[in-house]
């Protein structure tokens, strides 16, 4: 039934239609849900699962990540004479801005094991968060980071502190859990991660390419080099692998958005992983992702310079290239905008 109101002259008038509610930005929803998921997993990890890192490391990692992100954004705003992206929307704007740093910090802390030394973890968090400001490329007309922040921080730490630290041991993710609870943990992680990637980040094709490529490389290594098939495939059954698949490699800010490109990206990581394994290089998951992201960034820079040279050769009547400085002065927004990272990515 249509509601009416009585006008002053006695005529019936229809009230103005209600304002349609603006739909929430899916990128913000992805960041928020990733942050909630990784925070909850940290809490459960220290209380129920058996995480062996000191629980204060998570707090220190968050403080380090927040401080690094705010410092670099303040410096960038001063250098390019613009307002810092975390200002302008009050506490809500600051909260949205810090979501990527929150995800990245917790992911680095969760996946690195440095015994009782926090400094390597702190170094990894600083490298991860600062990489979004340092390692950038002209992507679709604006400067954006191309290295997966959490993955890069972990990879650099494993290279610099190879004698001190390692990846968190796989048993840590279910050490205190009972037999049936251990079966429940990967199901929950797999279900929640799949829902996030299917509905918000739209990275299902990437997961298919990565999982399919990983499965194929195990069979290829078995047939050609005699690698034990059950050993090569057993990696896919671990909780750490599921976390990596759903929360790190699918980082929206550093992975392709088109399904075909996503599939190629995921398959490429699996291929590089197989090469690293045959070269007896450990921590292949993280190094493979860093290598593929680095080549993707070099590809963007190569495409930019080729177009620039073509534009210069075309003369005044040719196509006009955007000045790099102008592109750099318009960075992607971090809160609900383009500077999406999880762990940035959300990563765990």
What are these regions (language model features)?
Residues 2-81, 85-86:
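N-terminal signal-anchor module of multipass membrane proteins
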Residues 16-18, 34-52, 69-70, 103-112, ...:
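Membrane-embedded alpha-helical segments in integral membrane proteins
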Residues 20-37, 217-325:
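C-terminal transmembrane helix-loop-helix hairpin of multi-pass membrane proteins
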Residues 37, 57-69, 73, 100-108, ...:
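Alpha-helical transmembrane segments in multi-pass membrane proteins
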Residues 53-64, 114-126, 171-186, 229-240:
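Structural signature of hydrophobic alpha-helical transmembrane segments
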Residues 68-89, 128-143, 190-202, 245-255:
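C-terminal ends of transmembrane helices
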Residues 83-178:
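Membrane-interface helix-loop-helix junctions at boundaries between adjacent transmembrane segments
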Residues 161-216:
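Internal active-site segments that recognize and position negatively charged phosphoryl groups
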